[in-house]
Amino acid sequence: MRRASRSPFILSPVAHAVSRLVLCATLGWTYAGSGHAQVPAPAGGSEVPLGARPPASAPVAAQQETPLKLKSSPALAEEVPNGPGDEGPTFVFGDSVSGRPNLETVIDGNAELRRGATSIRADRIEYYQPEDRVKSRGNVRINNAGNRFEGPELEITLDRFEGFFTQPRYRFLSNGGNGQAERVDFIDDKHLTAHRASYTTCERDNEASWKPAWELRARSFEFDFDEEVGVANGAVLRFKNVPILGFPKFSFPLSDKRKSGLLPPTLNMSSVNGFEVRQPYYFDIAPNRDATFSPAIMTKRGVDLAGEFRYLEPTYKGELRANILPGDKLRNRDRWSYGYQHSGTIDSGLSAIGNLGVNLNLSRVSDNDYWRDFPIASNSTTQRLLAQDATVSWNRGFFAAAVRTLKWQTLQDLSAPIVPPYDRLPQFTANYTRVDAPLLGLGRGFDWSVEGDYTRFSADRTLTGQPNSNRAFTRAQLSHPWLSPAGFITPKMQLHATSYQFDAPLVNGARSASRTVPTFSLDSGLQFERQAGFLGRSFTQTLEPRAFYVRTPYRDQSLLPNYDSGANDFNFATVFTENAFVGNDRISDANLLTLGVTSRLLDPATGAEAVRVGVAQRLRFADQRVTLPGALPITDRISDLLVGASVNWVPQWSFDSTVQYNPKTKQSERSSIGVRYNPGNYRVISAAYRRQRNISEQIDVGWQWPLNDLWGDKGRDLGAGQGQGGGRYYAVGRLNYSVPDRKLVDAIVGVEYDGCCWIGRVVLQRTQNGTATSDTRILFQLELVGFSRIGANPLETLKSNVPRYQYLREKINTPSRFTTYD
């Protein structure tokens, strides 16, 4: 029997007689990790790696007297592989070490044993080499790849990681989940069973009176770290020490990895549907496929069945949603809806053609009232036009072509009927485009293109009041941009040609019509720069005047039906365009000049734009005679004046404003003003005022802000997706107020509470779904961080409605095993 004071050991199946206090031997083979050690060279002069058995002729004394040579590694491996054989080297440390070679080693006082990614600390450790078994007593702590266990007694076989731990506390690396048990049985290094145990993601503190805000208590837990799943048997979920849910068997995630099983139920209270309970079940079909089945009970309507299927491949992806409500008790009929989206490419099988692009967007519902009764299911409270749209496209080099079919379902409201758009059954498009290309020996620099469109427009003539038609449209254009740092000039010529074949005669008796319209435009601009200083800051100030002239002769189009044209909105994006209309049924006559000027203040170091101010106005040299059906021609020689400003002087503040001013009436026709204050994460307030004279006037306010600021608690900046610390309340919401009607149009108001390991949310949502009707619902959710969510889910509602809303918790990467390194 030999004893040694506090010193490191490397254990070996071969005993070496030693007389020094530092004992070194090897067990197994060299560990291919962060370091490499060598024992002194034998008589032949070659070195023997640490962990390899020396030749029989190597003098034992020489091996013991010469220090080990360690070679450092630049990084520690995140995954620690086993060495050759099934063992790595085993290291032991302690105040006192005793034992028998090849049989057992006993470490007393500050005992420690390490192998690979496993470390064991205790008051006493007994290591039995033949069985590779460890017994530990007193203040035992084991860390296996970042998962930690603490308790009074541990017995484990290291090579199989099989054994038990009595009365341990544990903490898992992947999500911070922790708890305690009467006993833990280790099945292997990836599987264990905890008996009469608890589980929570609340961070434990050192107070003896500490209790988690929530915990799951169970007769037993089965933890699978390969699948990153836990299973609780005979479980009760307790919140604030009050039992709220019981489960005979319940599985839950140990990370964000997907798994099949029941998802948390959602609860909704709605003035339209009553109280709703929905229980989703998730199917993890494959890494690139999944599905969700979501049955629900609505107290006012009945049983609703919903489902979703998603797939993702290298060249395509898609999503299918379906919903059926048999025997709706409020409408006395079956209700249903479906939606399908697909996008990707397919191989045509012909090398000359190559791949084809395929895009599908199909949606349909059972009746006209669906959008009003189920605004969430139909994805939009104003979704009254549902498309069944399918497109096959192809492109190669400068050429592109597509075939499309588009059919609409129009959901009518008797109090606010709409004219349905035309179906396109089918539509063929093609275009050929060249940029910076040569032309007729004139050299390069020309941009030219030819595009064609053939469409069959179809709709109910009793609703549209005009015949259906086959329309062929062609547009050719040629331009030559001259560009320089000081400015640009771009002359352009266009030719529009259109022909129609009608299924019923026009008012003049014609069953066909044609139209050819040329257009010439000249776009030009200059750019001046200077260094300037404002309010103590240095900027590069620009002055960018622009002039745009367009000339299109008049062609009578008053008898032509309108299938897809509409008036362009008058704004900075459209004021410098040739046609006053979108679509191809109306080409506006024009003899006008648009003048504008923009000035910007740019940060000379970053190029960031601090201020932008712009003005634009059209000067008309002749009346615009081409109009949409029922509209009046434009005779004003001077258009409304557009004035816009954008200010981002400091990152926290932003300001945007656009005004359309009528110089004749000296009144604003349209105006919008928006301001946002965003000093940091989870602090944002935005407000906007929008007015269109004699039509609408609205005030829009949105916010997310910590209420704790009111009493001086500023919290901590933990970064986006991590909140600002526990015990904090956040106000969230958005209000849209109609000034003429003196009422709220839409409203979302809520409060979130961050309790560190749990988050509570209460959100009130009011949605206008008709001229005189609205839907009000209350969304309540309890989120047990890293575990589950219970109740209605308001997160997507908040994200899509509250400007710059941030989640209090977002997915983060699994921590490194060195986070809990011992």
From Swiss-Prot:
Assembly, per entry: Component of the lipopolysaccharide transport and assembly complex. Interacts with LptE and LptA.
Main location: membrane
Name of protein: LPS-assembly protein LptD
Keywords: Cell outer membrane, Membrane, Signal
UniProt cross-references to HAMAP family, sorted A to Z: LPS_assembly_LptD
One record GO biological process: Gram-negative-bacterium-type cell outer membrane assembly
GO CC aspect terms: cell outer membrane; transporter complex
Annotated gene: lptD
Signal peptide limits: 1-37
Alphabetized InterPro entries for the sequence: LipoPS_assembly_LptD (IPR020889), LptD (IPR050218), LptD_C (IPR007543)
Chain's role: Together with LptE, is involved in the assembly of lipopolysaccharide (LPS) at the surface of the outer membrane.
Region (Disordered): 38-97
Domain of life, source organism: Bacteria
